[in-house]
Amino acid sequence: MQQLNPSEISEIIKQRIDNLAVSTEAQNEGTVVSVTDGIIRIHGLADVMYGEMIEFEGGVYGIALNLERDSVGAVVLGDYQGVAEGQSCKCTGRILEVPVGEELCGRVVDALGNPIDGKGPINAKKTDAIEKIAPGVIARQSVDQPVQIGLKAVDTMVPIGRGQRELIIGDRQTGKTAVAVDAIINQKGTGIKCIYVAIGQKASSVASVVRKLEEHGAMDHTIVVAATASDPASMQFLAPFAGCTMGEYFRDRGEDALIIYDDLTKQAWAYRQISLLLRRPPGREAYPGDVFYLHSRLLERAARVNADYVEQLTNGEVKGKTGSLTALPIIETQAGDVSAFVPTNVISITDGQIFLETDLFNAGIRPAMNAGISVSRVGGSAQTKVIKKLSGGIRTALAQYRELAAFSQFASDLDEATKAQLEHGERVTELMKQKQYSPQSVGEMAVVVYAANEGYLKDVEVSKIGDFESALLSYMNSSHADLMNTMNGGSYSDEIAGQLKSALDTFKATQTW
């Protein structure tokens, strides 16, 4: 048996004590109790905050959403296959942040701001929290500048202003995304940055939208945030908040941004899934009690803010500029039921809605907007002067036409005035049709609406209205470019009206279509 030397033992112990690294950092740790469907229940973490990031073994993160007496319920961000019962986890003291800034323009990112388009890393200089409090009443400014969508039906009847929230609502396959994509394409050259948030869609659908935006040169001013159907519910729930934070960066620097949430029904479904898995009490349609707050706190962040607010946030770097974030949330209805829980919630939060109908879409009227139900509550004060002046008769003509068309089915003999109204309404309906990816300028809309109001379409066959419009716009852009530029600037006067009348008279007399 080997003899142990007491001095050697004491020397080894002394070395071990000297080499012992003692960390004084206090960490709030817990133990994973269960892992089910992306929801992790944790024992411990006594001082965790609501919404705080929790780090699990293997570099996986989660967010604390349920704070109970004995445990914490957290939702995992991304893949949770490596998380197992008995593993330890710790608080990070941080809330979830995403990258923001100009560097994101032209890129496709996930709900955490990671690039998913294969174009390399995004070198964003700043990050910001995804959950922020909306600007207060004093920080806001009234909506009085337009966002031109480029669709005649929308810009004439339901104008949208910078800082407004305008809901696009309709059944599946009624052209909701088409309206939103046209809005993005039309912002090219206006300085308005666009954020398109795709929630719960097929990856192929998102790729198709991105391809169309690239074809029309609109990706340069657009950020696409995608949480597809294959992504976890947590990502689909967070994506709109991430997109909103990216848009707020531009708003808070005195710039203008437009954000599209496509669509918030899927976000509500994802939130319902998370809430039920967290064992929160279900309410109407099994949604949790705070699903209204989910959408209201998101949509209230879209606003027009005054110059003082911008100056304060930029520490005096940007002076005398107001900023805005305009939101176009999309809601998908089931069989036209706008009285369901989520549609009624979002209708009450937003400043108006564009209602798209299946029957109109199937009848070939696209965009399939129902002019009677669609409304813009604040956009009227933001409408361009020339469009506001000319478009008053359009909504009335369409509303009367639909009423008379329904009535005339039961009447055999109609008087001349009613017949004239029906014919005019039919022509206006035809005139409001517009091909996808072909937005019109203010001047082009003004010419078309003026022609309808002043009776230039009376002797044009309904089937020829589209050809008439194309020929008229081609003629005006080539022969009266100065007049078109003046109207594109938004101005309108008796002199311009006289020039328009003269140009249209000449067109009717000399041109063919």
Swiss-Prot record:
Location, primary (coarse class): membrane
Coiled coil ranges: none
Record bears the keyword NADP: no
Subcellular location: Cell inner membrane
Residue sites binding ATP per the record: G170, D171, R172, Q173, T174, G175, K176, T177
SUPFAM superfamilies per the UniProt record, alphabetical: C-terminal domain of alpha and beta subunits of F1 ATP synthase, N-terminal domain of alpha and beta subunits of F1 ATP synthase, P-loop containing nucleoside triphosphate hydrolases
Reactions this protein catalyses: ATP + H2O + 4 H(+)(in) = ADP + phosphate + 5 H(+)(out)
Cellular component GO terms held in the UniProt record: plasma membrane; proton-transporting ATP synthase complex
Cysteine disulfide links: none
GO molecular function, one term: ADP binding
Annotated site (Required for activity): S374
EC number, as in UniProt: 7.1.2.2
Keywords per UniProt: ATP synthesis, ATP-binding, Cell inner membrane, Cell membrane, CF(1), Hydrogen ion transport, Ion transport, Membrane, Nucleotide-binding, Translocase, Transport
InterPro entries: ATP_synth_asu-like_sf, ATP_synth_asu_C, ATP_synth_asu_C_sf, ATP_synth_F1_a_nt-bd_dom, ATP_synth_F1_asu, ATPase_F1/V1/A1_a/bsu_N, ATPase_F1/V1/A1_a/bsu_N_sf, ATPase_F1/V1/A1_a/bsu_nucl-bd
Membrane topology field: Peripheral membrane protein
PANTHER family in the record: ATP SYNTHASE SUBUNIT ALPHA, MITOCHONDRIAL (PTHR48082:SF2)
Assembly mode: F-type ATPases have 2 components, CF(1) - the catalytic core - and CF(0) - the membrane proton channel. CF(1) has five subunits: alpha(3), beta(3), gamma(1), delta(1), epsilon(1). CF(0) has three main subunits: a(1), b(2) and c(9-12). The alpha and beta chains form an alternating ring which encloses part of the gamma chain. CF(1) is attached to CF(0) by a central stalk formed by the gamma and epsilon chains, while a peripheral stalk is formed by the delta and b chains.
Function: Produces ATP from ADP in the presence of a proton gradient across the membrane. The alpha chain is a regulatory subunit.
Family in the record: Belongs to the ATPase alpha/beta chains family.
NCBIfam families in the record: atpA (TIGR00962), PRK13343.1 (NF009884)
Name of the featured protein: ATP synthase subunit alpha
Record lineage: Bacteria, Pseudomonadati, Pseudomonadota, Gammaproteobacteria, Cellvibrionales
Gene from which the chain derives: atpA
